[in-house]
Amino acid sequence: MKKILFLSVLISTLSCSNKKEVKHVAEISCGQCQFELDSETGCDLAVRIDSKAYFVDGFDIDAFGDAHDEHTGFCEVIRKAEIKGVLENGRFKASSVKLVDNLK
């Protein structure tokens, strides 16, 4: 019985800690202004993966220029980016964000 309990705990621990970093080309923009997310106040960076939007942790919305610039700002346009990270607790924990569109 102890062996079964030990194996159950071990398998559970391994499956929970196996969060693999994913790499996607996804839409990236302001969660509130463009993706209609409302669980944060102010403007925050978000990505849309498979038609679902997630707030981004690890990068600030102004890290890529003025968020309110009418041609390139995340509050004004939806852009494309190559993103790497982990989906965790309904948020995207980003380790890398590289814009891949040609907006300047």
Predicted regions and their residues:
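OB-fold (S1/OB) nucleic-acid-binding surfaces
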Residues: 40-60
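Structural detector for short beta-strands of small beta-barrel domains
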Residues: 21-43
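Positively charged n-region of N-terminal signal peptides that target proteins for export
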Residues: 1-4
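OB-fold/S1-family single-stranded nucleic acid-binding modules
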Residues: 88-104
